[in-house]
Design a protein with these regions (language model features):
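Bacterial N-terminal signal peptides that target proteins for export
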Residues: 2-12
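Bacterial N-terminal signal peptides
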Residues: 10-21
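Auxiliary tRNA-acceptor-end handling modules of aminoacyl-tRNA synthetases
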Residues: 26-300, 318, 333-385, 390-407, ...
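Zn2+-dependent metallopeptidase catalytic core
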Residues: 62, 301-327
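Soluble non-cytosolic domains of exported or imported proteins
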Residues: 65, 298, 302-310, 409-418, ...
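Sec-exported extracytoplasmic/periplasmic mature domains
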Residues: 313-324, 424-425, 429, 450, ...
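The catalytic-center signature of Zn2+-dependent metalloproteases
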Residues: 332-350, 413-468
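Conserved catalytic/binding loops enriched for acidic/polar residues
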Residues: 436, 440-827
Length: 827
């Protein structure tokens, strides 16, 4: 071939390539023509006319990766149902997502950082990566490719309208129906597509349909067959390598993350635990570079907004104690800011049809635990329930007075605590359920019960109801999590801090050792108060009795329907429920701390029997007719529940009862007794009592506890009136049912079954002696026990079906026990 021919052919090929390139670029330009361009983390084109969002992804690398980001999904618009839990602002995700080219498509792949190799060997890291699954959660066609820059244009809309937070599964799992995503009714909200230098934010309306919606959906949705929520997608720039990880330590109340390092030395641990925390650094002059800043939802009304701001600011003292004065602050969210914008750590004020839980959470880097965004959800109806509780205690005439016993002021004090508590979770702090027992409430990360005190003159003192400010434990944990270790290895610096905590007398009790009524740490409980759980229960019972005896018209606001008394009496009648649980932890309980080899911390000890016996006496006091009775004049004020069509809270806050429309005292007593028996007869507690009796002559053991209980409940020699005798019969019958359930229950320890069987036979013998004086009750109890013994496999029955306990906690859910002032985010 001559040079001329070769050169001519080269010109022709080059011209063709240029033409193709120009055509490709023209196609790319044509595809984005007229669309709104948003520059930032990812080049974005918004098509308002067709409700589309297009992404121009960077040129793929040699592995086909066109971008890697932190990905999180939320709901901008929720369902508004606490039992279902599809609330606005609760984050899902926090994974690293990679957009990868595969042929003519781009896939979104969630990387697996739970298993990794930190070794330098590429082959070793690759071996781990290919040993565990990843997750492709979306794919989209490549619309155009920019020949000049290599950028890929993809329609991101179907990613944004996916069921990213698992709405259908959640609705089905909560018994609300089999819902399916309706694609033609799920559209991107192009007016809520935002792109910033380090994050992108997108909203989309997503609709789920069914032909059989459940109760909660019917209550909260205008057309229950079509549930439309607003899904939110966040993409965040991967953090740089400057973040310093911090080791997690189970002796401090931290929120951690875990991964498995397959390249760990053979003599080392493959499981690596890191603490989650914000990046907090100082410049060369020792000043904080980028303070942690939280924002209060501007949708929260005053005076609630001010209380949230004030409580949130308490953490500033903890950061100052950690060596970072000015390292933390709180402001009100500016107008016009999307509450899910990743640039802002937001305390969201969220409404539901019924009262519910609050949460503190975070979006973090799964590689390091670095918190990139704090997210707090506060349920708005909680404050109203708190007011109801305090109106039952103090009287409604105190509302709005501004005095120490003003229910509104008391509820706002609780809101300050709630703000600090949930922000604490977002900062990386876990619960310390032992903090209520020392240093006048050592932490905002405990669950605070109101410290209302009974005076000798029959009045109530509300001046100590809630603490103010951050606690001593919080300052110590702030040093542990955020303080500078000055070049010391984490393990060494943390060991020094643990010694400091021990010298001070700090106590940490974790969620698993506190939350359930059956747990065994004597000072680990929720919604308790006071340094001595037993003395606090005595005080709580006095407060309850004082308020119950004067309960009536003074507990109503002007013009309020008398029906309201039936809901206000519930938290008052059950006012002792959580302090009862706290006191019961001493029965069969232990005192212990979390220990590491060589740290010199003390070994566990069993609670002395004299304290256990006092706890037993107090529990039995809560089951006495005197404790369960209500004055006749109080009962007469409890007007029948009226009809309230459409009120989702109506009825659920009152005692159920076969005696309606009259107030059913026996049903209320059944509910209270159920709580006492839950505490006394928790199977785990019975196992510990039996073991302690076997191990030491100083502890009489389970048999003694059951015998003492039987003697107390079956004591009909006190000359009680007809109502109180009926209450005694009720409680004794409920006790028999519990013993039957324990004796023939499948999951009960054999040693416990033997003891409860003996107690059941003893109860029958006591009933035999009552035949002459109380034939009807005695005969019925004997027959019930005899029938259970004859069948030998009677299904466990905790209490009669009517003995439902009204919700105490926001609503009581799988997250934990029922309580009136609940908040958890670690949860």
């Amino acid at each position: 071939m001559t040079f001329t021919k070769f050169f001519t052919r080269g010109l022709m090929v080059g011209a063709a390539s240029v033409a193709l390139s120009l055509a490709a670029n023209a196609d790319f330009a044509e595809a984005t023509k007229g669309l709104e361009f948003k520059d930032g983390l990812v080049s974005t084109y918004v098509d308002h006319a067709k409700a589309r969002v297009l992404l121009a992804l960077d040129k793929p690398d040699e592995n086909g990766i066109a971008g890697r980001y932190i990905y999180a999904a939320y709901l901008t618009g929720g369902l508004g149902s606490n039992p279902v839990g599809l609330d606005r602002s609760v984050p899902a995700g926090g994974e690293i997502i990679a957009f990868r080219r595969m042929g003519n498509k781009v896939v979104a792949m969630v990387e697996n950082h739970n298993f990794r190799a930190t070794a330098d060997s590429t082959a070793e890291r690759r071996a781990v990566e290919t040993s565990f699954a990843q997750s492709i959660i979306w794919s989209g066609d490549i619309m155009e490719e920019d020949a000049e820059t290599g950028r890929l244009l993809v329609d991101f809309s179907s990613f944004l309208t996916r069921d990213a937070v698992g709405v259908a599964a959640r609705l089905k799992g909560r018994g609300e129906g089999s819902f399916s995503l309706v694609k033609d009714r799920s559209l991107v909200d192009t007016k809520a597509a935002f792109m910033f230098p380090e994050n992108g934010e997108f909203d989309a309306y997503v609709t789920f349909a069914t032909d059989k919606p459940g109760r909660e959906v019917r209550q909260t949705t205008p057309v229950p067959e079509a549930v439309t929520l607003i899904a939110h997608t966040t993409l965040i720039k991967l953090p740089d390598a400057g973040y310093q990880t911090r080791l997690y330590d189970d002796r401090a109340a931290l929120i951690g993350m875990t991964y498995v390092d397959m390249s760990a030395p053979l003599a080392g641990d493959t499981v690596v635990r890191l603490a989650r925390r914000f990046r907090l650094e100082k410049d060369e002059n020792g000043k904080v570079k980028n303070p942690i800043k939280f924002y209060i939802d501007n949708g929260a009304p005053e005076p609630i907004r001010g209380a949230l701001l004030e409580g949130g600011m308490w953490w500033a003292d903890a950061f100052a104690a950690a060596g970072y004065p000015g390292g933390y602050t709180v402001e009100v969210l500016p107008e016009g800011v999307h509450p899910l914008d990743a640039r802002y750590n937001v305390v969201n004020w969220v409404h539901r049809a019924t009262r519910g839980w609050s949460y503190g959470a975070a979006v973090s880097d799964p590689r390091t635990g670095e918190v990139l965004r704090g997210v707090v959800l506060l349920g708005s109806l909680r404050v109203r329930q708190d007011i109801k509780i305090f109106e039952a205690l103090a009287g409604a005439e105190k509302t709005g007075t501004g005095a120490a016993d003003d229910p509104v002021e008391l509820a706002l004090a609780r809101i300050r605590q709630l703000s600090a508590h949930e922000i604490g979770h977002a900062l990386g702090f876990a619960h310390n359920m032992g903090a209520s027992t020392y240093d006048e409430r050592a932490s905002v990360m405990d669950y605070p019960a109101p410290d209302v005190r009974a005076n000798e003159d029959g009045t109530l003192d509300f001046s100590h109801a809630y603490g103010v400010g951050i606690g001593t434990w919080d300052k110590w944990t702030a040093k542990f999590l955020y303080g500078d270790y000055n070049g010391k290895p984490d393990a060494e610096a943390q060991a020094e801090l643990i010694r400091e905590a021990d010298a001070h007398g700090h106590l940490y009790v974790s969620d698993p050792d506190s939350r359930s009524v059956s747990t065994g740490h004597a000072r680990g409980a929720v919604w308790d108060t006071g340094s001595d759980p037993l003395a606090s229960l005595e005080n709580t019972l006095k407060v309850r009795r004082i308020a119950l005896d004067r309960f009536g018209m003074d507990n109503l606001r002007d013009g309020e329907a008398l029906t309201a008394l039936q809901t206000k009496i519930v938290p008052l009648y059950l006012y002792h429920r959580y302090q009862l649980d706290a006191a019961a932890k001493s029965l069969g309980g232990m005192d212990f701390v979390y220990r590491h080899e060589g740290d010199g911390r003390p070994a566990p000890t069993v609670v002395p029997w004299e304290r256990q016996e006092k706890a037993l006496s107090l529990i039995l006091e809560t089951l006495s007719p005197e404790a369960l009775d209500v004055k006749d004049e109080v009962l007469m004020t409890l007007s029948p529940l009226g009809y309230s069509d459409g009120d989702p809270q109506f009825g659920r806050e009152a005692f159920d009862g076969a005696g309606r429309p009259a107030f059913d005292l026996m049903q209320a007593a059944s509910s209270a007794a159920a709580l006492s028996f839950d505490a006394l007869l928790a199977p785990e507690r019975l196992v510990r009592l039996d073991a302690q009796g076997d191990a030491s002559a100083e502890h009489p053991g389970l048999g003694f506890v059951l015998s003492r209980t039987s003697n107390s409940l079956m004591d009909f020699s006190k000359g009680e009136d007809a109502t109180q005798q009926g209450l005694r019969e009720l409680v004794a019958s409920l006790y028999a049912e519990r013993l039957i359930g324990l004796t023939f229950g499948e999951d009960v320890a054999p040693a416990v079954r033997l003891e409860t069987r003996a107690a059941l036979m003893g109860l029958k013998a006591k009933a035999e002696k009552l035949k002459r004086s109380n034939a009807h009750f005695a005969s019925g109890l004997i027959a019930r026990i005899g029938d259970a013994m004859a069948r030998a496999r009677t299904p466990a029955v905790k209490e009669p079906a009517a003995a439902t306990v009204p919700p105490g906690s926001p609503i009581g859910s799988e997250l934990g026990e029922a309580c009136w002032h609940c908040d958890t985010g670690t949860e």
